[in-house]
Amino acid sequence: MSAHQDVKKVVLAYSGGLDTSVILRWLQKTYNCEVVTFTADLGQGEELEPARKKAEMFGVKEIFVEDLRETFVKDFVFPMFRANTLYEGQYLLGTSIARPLIAQRQIEIAEAVGADAVAHGATGKGNDQVRFELGYYSLKPDVKVIAPWREWDLTSRTKLLAFAEENQIPVTKDKRGEAPFSVDANLLHSSSEGKLLEDPSIGAEEIVFQRTISPEAAPDVATEITIDFVSGDPVAINGVEMTPATLLTRLNELGRDNGIGRLDIVENRFVGMKSRGIYETPGGTILLAAHRSIESITLDREAAHLKDSIMPRYAEIIYNGFWFSPERRMLQALIDTSQHSVTGRVRMRLYKGNVTCVGRESPHSLYDTRVVTFEDDEGAYNQQDAQGFIKLNALRLRLGGQIGRRGGTL
């Protein structure tokens, strides 16, 4: 029996677009199996009912279209932001953080419907194939994974369109021509890559930006907002409590209107190549600045520095697709422990692409005006204590300096 004959039912991560519609029909023809479609609403801003109708058109009997926006923000985005996560110092991981949830629900659906395989539409060049499959294998080690882009001979857009035509797959007019760039989006961000953007020496045209106005076109008057945090997570804007997805949606609107969150980056993919991307993360950019600001008065110095030191590793773990790994869980436990006192309010000023904290307060603030004042501190801090502190810290430097002088190295 061939490997194709072993598969009776497969759960496909299905967007309803050209690529995954071709994959759906290809699975039916190549594997002669039942296909179950799963479409996740992660806030990508697209109408998802057409995906359901298209799946029905292909004879799919079990169709899952789910609104996962709240779960996405609460259980994936917010835990990541507690760490102030940036990959290679810049990227807020908007694509990376969406893949574990999709993989998780695919496996849950596969087990619920008795499927023996899962499939995705990620290409063989990118990171997403790794992220999806590491998620699958973490949650169901014996699952069979079908990655059509690594199997089929549809190696060009011309071949994809020809397959679509042969199999009566509807193709919208805008998909018939070569798209100038590829877009991926969710509630946290949008990314644009490829084709028009492949030359990193050429700046992106304004048409590329999907979610933000240009900073130059932003209002000439700053917008000020307050964000309330409880245990490291944002809970309210301007005093109005909101659900996680609603709050991020509102921050996206504020960031969009003020030209905030644009990034043009060349990053190092896990698979080995460098990739140029245009990212827009308006709400996330505000949230990162706000979270760091409330931490500045609530975290102990050494705890804050330790947290900053592990952040690059934590970011790399998520970027590479190891969300369900023991090392990510270990680091998450440490990060979450640090957030117990990260409660309070910050006031942020949004202006022409910039986010600035202009005020912060917390019932757990470690900032003591009695100690730091330039006026009489009434004995709160004895400046003479600094002499011994400096001498002890200088001891190794003085000893090293003496040896260096004797050896002629100073």
UniProtKB/Swiss-Prot annotation:
One of its GO terms (biological process) is L-arginine biosynthetic process. Its EC number is 6.3.4.5. Pathway: Amino-acid biosynthesis; L-arginine biosynthesis; L-arginine from L-ornithine and carbamoyl phosphate: step 2/3. ATP binds at A13, Y14, S15, G16, G17, L18, D19, T20, S21, A40, G121. One of its GO terms (cellular component) is cytoplasm. InterPro entries: Arginosuc_syn_C (IPR048268), Arginosuc_syn_N (IPR048267), Arginosuc_synth (IPR001518), Arginosuc_synth_CS (IPR018223), Arginosuc_synth_type_1_subfam (IPR023434), AS_cat/multimer_dom_body (IPR024074), Rossmann-like_a/b/a_fold (IPR014729). Gene3D superfamilies: Argininosuccinate synthetase, chain A, domain 2, HUPs, Single helix bin. Its main location: cytoplasm. Keywords: Amino-acid biosynthesis, Arginine biosynthesis, ATP-binding, Cytoplasm, Ligase, Nucleotide-binding. It catalyses: L-citrulline + L-aspartate + ATP = 2-(N(omega)-L-arginino)succinate + AMP + diphosphate + H(+). NCBIfam families: argG, PRK00509.1. HAMAP family: Arg_succ_synth_type1. This is Argininosuccinate synthase. It comes from Gluconobacter oxydans (strain 621H). The gene is argG.
